[in-house]
Amino acid sequence: MMSASFKCPVSLSGVENICNGDKAIPGINSRTLFTGSSFLQRHHSANKIFFRTCGKKGSCCLFNIRAMAETDSGNGVPQLDISLSPRVAALKPSKTMAITDLATALKQAGVPVIGLAAGEPDFNTPDAVAEAGIKAIQDGYTRYTPNAGTMEIRTAICHKLKEENGLSYTPDQILVSNGAKQCIMAAAVLAVCSPGDEVIIPAPFWVSYTEMARLADATPVIIPTLLSDDFLLNPEVFSSKLNENSRLLILCSPSNPTGSVYPRELLEEIAKIVAKHPKLLVLSDEIYEHIMYPPAKHTSFASLPGMWERTLTVNGFSKAFAMTGWRLGYLAGPKHFVTACGRIQSQSTSGASSISQKAGVAALALGYAGSEAVSTMVKAYRERRDFLVQRLQAMEGVKLPVPQGAFYLFPDFSSYYGTEVEDFGVINGSEALCRFFLEKAQVALVPGDAFGNDDCIRISYAASLDTLRTAINNIEKSLLLLRPAAAASKAS
């Protein structure tokens, strides 16, 4: 096993020859497993791994190389087959994790990077919820629970859905999982999709939706949306994309990454189209439902006429209750589908943590929409949103719709694309712009192409106002380096 890491500009010594395109790492054959940054050439021949040029002097990049090489033993012993499933090859690497890894490397090198890439609250779990988890441990409540979740938490979820969403379910129509992500994977993809089925996904989208579809040998069908429409699905365009293979529509409201909220009137239009297609189901991702800014209001898709039978509603505790590490989510839907999802879960992880389930019950007991514990966090999010919106909308060349929920902004910086910056290179898209901000502004953001829209970048405002103020000041200063170049580019 060979493992090596290269960091630039921390140490360029010994790296330039590897990166300049005419050198290679010897002794590794064509069945090498490797991971790396975007500088790594995906094409590799026997005994060689090539790298693209790392950029001009001073550019930041990180290479992690882990290789397991086959050796010629000469003793006639068959060599180990280390090939992987085609499913792995079909999955795209996470750009969110890539930017996080690069930011971490810079921090370790002493660069004061501000991280605005994470999709999790910066608040602590409410005290009453944390105490319920601690009490569960102290009481010895540390054993397996039923696969679908305890009757206590499923009953509490049914009560929540009835009181807050106008939805009627029984406990056997609820599946509690290790986070909402597992519910989506088990429900939206593996349980209802077959090879050849199509999963309809409006873009921008959460990064995992498309990869989940591919894991089930289904085909993701991406429908772009417009900034001028607040990144909401256009019913006419949606209708034009449907056919006999359309199996699942995924809607996320409030949206990650845009913060857009679907108004009831638009959802009703979409529901009328869905009703015309007997095979089509809807997965409604409502994980951000409590992080809303008036006058926006949340509507559960399953509450619309004729949609209860077609809808799989996914929700959880991570975002509203600042419980990302507790890993607790749930699915609600017709028993036929929920039972199937439970069968898949039973053969993978089984039930969610008993301790987390006790904490989840306590969270739901806080009151309507989490009561003061959640509203206090939402008030802080809104203050941060308003601050960033004001600053970004005042910047030259930046377009930004005002998000109505979640804790993300998705501004359009495409007016700066195509420009070349000295000691950096060309800003040819959102990934390059995020690397530019990381290097020049020391701010970690997520490129929009990871979400299906290369014009934009995602900014998380799950950080203190002081942190956001420093970050936006740094971003604004760094853009001064691009404005002359952008003007020259347009003039030519």
UniProtKB/Swiss-Prot annotation:
UniProt-listed Enzyme Commission number(s): 2.6.1.1
InterPro entries named among the record's database cross-references: Aminotransferase_I/II_large (IPR004839), AspAT/PAT-like (IPR050596), NHTrfase_class1_PyrdxlP-BS (IPR004838), PyrdxlP-dep_Trfase (IPR015424), PyrdxlP-dep_Trfase_major (IPR015421), PyrdxlP-dep_Trfase_small (IPR015422)
Required co-factors: pyridoxal 5'-phosphate
Span of the signal peptide: none
Positions of post-translational N6-(pyridoxal phosphate)lysine modification: K319
Residues that coordinate or bind L-aspartate: G119, W206, N256, R458
Catalytic activity: L-aspartate + 2-oxoglutarate = oxaloacetate + L-glutamate
Keyword Chloroplast in record: yes
GO molecular function: L-aspartate:2-oxoglutarate aminotransferase activity; pyridoxal phosphate binding
Class in the EC hierarchy, top level: transferase
UniProt KW keywords: Aminotransferase, Chloroplast, Plastid, Pyridoxal phosphate, Transferase, Transit peptide
A GO BP annotation: biosynthetic process
Transit peptide, start-end: 1-66
Main location, first listed in the record: plastid
Protein family according to the UniProt entry: Belongs to the class-I pyridoxal-phosphate-dependent aminotransferase family.
Subunit annotation: Homodimer.
Extra information: The orthologous protein in Arabidopsis has an additional glutamate/aspartate-prephenate aminotransferase activity.
Functional summary from the UniProt entry: Prokaryotic-type aspartate aminotransferase. Specific for aspartate and no activity with glutamine, asparagine, alanine, histidine, leucine, methionine, lysine, arginine, tryptophan, tyrosine, phenylalanine or kynurenine.
Identification of the protein by name: Aspartate aminotransferase
Species, as recorded: Pinus pinaster
Gene: AAT
